[in-house]
C-alpha cells in the first residue's frame, strides 16, 4: 500500500502542470484557481469535521497558517498557472523541482536550520538543468512570453519555499496537517475570491469536458487525495524519503509534455531533466539501497 501511495503522488503531482495546460483559459486563471481552492477547502473542512483530529492550532498559530495558505496555495499556484500557460509544463515542472534547494535555504534564513553542503551542490546541478532546458528559448528573440513564464515560475517556487517555512513552523507546533490544509486552502480561496471580485469578473463555469475533467483532477486528485496520501507517507516512511519523489517530477512532466505534443523531444530536454533529477536527489540526500549495491 505504501508503494502504491508513493507512485500515486509521484505521477499525480508530476502531471500537475500538464493538467493546468489542458484546462486552458476559457475563463481567467484567477477564476479557475478560485474554483480549485474553494472545492478543496470544503473537502478538507469536511474531513476535519469527520475525523476531528488532535493538534488543533491556537490563536498564535493562525498568522503562520495564513502565510502557509497564501504562499503555498494562492499566490504560488497563481504564478505557476501563469507560467504554465506562458511557457510549457515541462519547463515549469523543472523549475518547481528547485523547491528542494530553495526550501532548505529559506529554512536556514528564517528558522536558522542547518544547511547541508549537499543542498548547495545539488542546487548547482538543478540550476544547470534549468539553464540547459531553457537555453533554446532564451536564444530566440521571439520567446518573450517564455521568458516571462520562466521568471514567474521562479517567483512561484520561491513563494512555495516561504510557505514551506511556515509549514515547518506549524509542524514544530504539533499542528495536525489536516487542520493546516483546511485552513490554508480556506485562506487561499478567500484571497483568490477577493482578487476575482476586485477584477470584476463574471462568474461562469465552463462546461467543456477538458475543463471540467482538468478541474476535477486538480481538486479531487492533485489537491485532496494526493495530499492525504502524502501525509500518510510522511507518517509511515518519514518526510525525507517522501520528498524523494520531487526529484522525479521533471521526468514525469517532461515525458507527458512530449506525449501531448507540447514540447519536442530534444537533447536539451533530456539533459535538463537528467541534471535536475540528479541535483534534487543529491539535495534530498538520496542513497542507493544496500540490496542494490550488493547486486
Predicted region positions:
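C-terminal transmembrane-helix exit sites in multi-pass transporters
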Residues: 46-52, 99-124, 251-270
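Glycine-/small-residue-enriched transmembrane alpha-helix faces in small-molecule transporters
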Residues: 1-31, 143-169, 188-191
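Helix-helix packing/entry segments at the starts of transmembrane helices
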Residues: 33-35, 91-98, 166-189, 219-259
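Juxtamembrane helix-entry segments on the extracytoplasmic side of multipass membrane proteins
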Residues: 1-2, 26-30, 34, 57-63, ...
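Transmembrane alpha-helices of multi-pass small-molecule transport proteins
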Residues: 26-75, 102-103, 159-166, 182-200, ...
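Hydrophobic transmembrane alpha-helices of multi-pass small-molecule transport proteins
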Residues: 44, 115-137, 192, 247, ...
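Specific transmembrane alpha-helical segments of multi-pass solute transporters/efflux pumps
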Residues: 12, 16-17, 45-96, 132, ...
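Hydrophobic/aromatic residues within transmembrane alpha-helices
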Residues: 23, 32, 36, 83, ...
Amino acid at each position: 500500500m505504501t508503494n502504491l501511495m508513493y507512485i500515486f503522488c509521484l505521477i499525480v503531482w508530476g502531471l500537475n502542470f500538464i493538467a493546468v495546460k489542458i484546462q486552458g483559459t476559457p475563463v481567467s486563471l484567477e477564476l479557475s484557481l478560485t474554483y480549485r481552492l474553494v472545492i478543496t477547502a470544503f473537502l478538507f473542512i469536511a474531513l476535519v469535521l469527520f475525523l476531528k483530529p488532535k493538534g488543533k492550532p491556537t490563536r498564535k498559530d493562525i498568522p503562520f497558517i495564513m502565510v502557509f495558505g497564501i504562499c503555498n496555495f494562492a499566490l504560488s499556484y497563481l504564478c505557476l498557472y501563469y507560467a504554465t500557460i506562458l511557457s510549457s509544463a515541462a519547463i515549469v515542472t523543472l523549475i518547481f523541482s528547485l523547491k528542494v534547494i530553495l526550501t532548505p535555504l529559506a529554512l536556514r534564513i528564517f528558522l536558522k536550520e542547518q544547511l547541508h553542503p549537499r543542498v548547495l551542490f545539488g542546487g548547482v546541478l538543478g540550476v544547470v538543468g534549468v539553464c540547459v532546458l531553457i537555453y533554446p528559448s532564451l536564444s530566440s528573440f521571439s520567446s518573450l512570453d517564455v521568458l516571462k513564464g520562466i521568471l514567474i515560475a521562479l517567483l512561484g517556487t520561491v513563494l512555495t519555499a516561504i510557505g514551506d517555512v511556515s509549514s515547518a513552523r506549524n509542524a514544530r507546533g504539533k499542528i495536525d496537517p489536516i487542520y493546516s490544509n483546511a485552513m490554508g486552502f480556506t485562506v487561499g480561496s478567500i484571497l483568490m475570491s477577493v482578487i476575482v471580485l476586485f477584477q470584476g469578473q463574471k462568474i461562469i463555469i465552463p462546461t467543456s469536458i477538458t475543463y471540467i475533467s482538468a478541474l476535477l483532477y486538480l481538486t479531487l486528485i492533485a489537491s485532496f487525495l494526493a495530499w492525504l496520501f502524502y501525509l500518510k507517507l510522511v507518517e509511515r516512511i518519514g518526510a525525507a524519503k517522501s520528498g524523494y519523489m520531487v526529484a522525479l517530477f521533471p521526468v514525469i512532466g517532461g515525458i507527458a509534455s512530449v506525449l501531448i505534443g507540447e514540447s519536442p523531444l530534444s537533447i536539451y530536454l533530456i539533459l535538463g531533466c537528467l541534471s535536475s533529477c540528479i541535483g534534487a536527489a543529491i539535495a534530498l540526500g538520496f542513497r542507493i539501497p544496500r540490496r542494490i549495491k550488493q547486486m
